[in-house]
């Protein structure tokens, strides 16, 4: 039995979970999320807890068991508290500013780089810090990764877009004469 998969998911007050065949729907104060269960996996709702089960010990079933449990748990967490990632823009002349719901970066290119906010994602800008927030953990992480990809941190000078608290492995420059 999967150590993560066998743990029940406790449903907090104010969150409504509906299981309809192979669809799990979670509704809470911050919004609603849906997920379709993979074929061999089943989920049951009893006494304020969701339990995820698998029919057999085949390799595919075992691998999907813990994954499905964690995805449902993240949905419950997302509709109650939400998720956020912080990014820092580091470097001379590197800036970020909010343009309505979207962002505009100056990252040393000959043009400003616009970033549109996907559905369900909000951006907050404080100086050179950007906070990406939303209820879907995967979407928040993917949006933050796409922003970081615009100008990855340089290993020589450390300039670029990085996650808050990320340690950049610096390289020594040329030795010279």
From Swiss-Prot:
Listed GO CC annotations? cytosolic large ribosomal subunit
Q: Which GO terms describe its biological process?
A: cytoplasmic translation
Report if keyword Translocase is assigned: no
Q: Which PROSITE patterns does its entry note?
A: RIBOSOMAL_L6_1
Q: Which UniProt keywords apply?
A: Ribonucleoprotein, Ribosomal protein, RNA-binding, rRNA-binding
> Which Pfam family, any one, appears in the UniProt record?
Ribosomal_L6
Any one GO MF annotation of this record: rRNA binding
Entry's SUPFAM superfamilies? Ribosomal protein L6
Q: Which InterPro entries match?
A: Ribosomal_uL6-like, Ribosomal_uL6-like_a/b-dom_sf, Ribosomal_uL6_a/b-dom, Ribosomal_uL6_bac-type, Ribosomal_uL6_CS
What is the role of the protein in this entry?
A: This protein binds to the 23S rRNA, and is important in its secondary structure. It is located near the subunit interface in the base of the L7/L12 stalk, and near the tRNA binding site of the peptidyltransferase center.
Under the subunit heading, UniProt states: Part of the 50S ribosomal subunit.
Entry-linked PANTHER family = 60S/50S RIBOSOMAL PROTEIN L6/L9, LARGE RIBOSOMAL SUBUNIT PROTEIN UL6M
Q: Which family does it belong to?
A: Belongs to the universal ribosomal protein uL6 family.
Write the protein's name: Large ribosomal subunit protein uL6
The organism's lineage is: Bacteria, Bacillati, Actinomycetota, Actinomycetes, Micrococcales
* Gene (name only): rplF
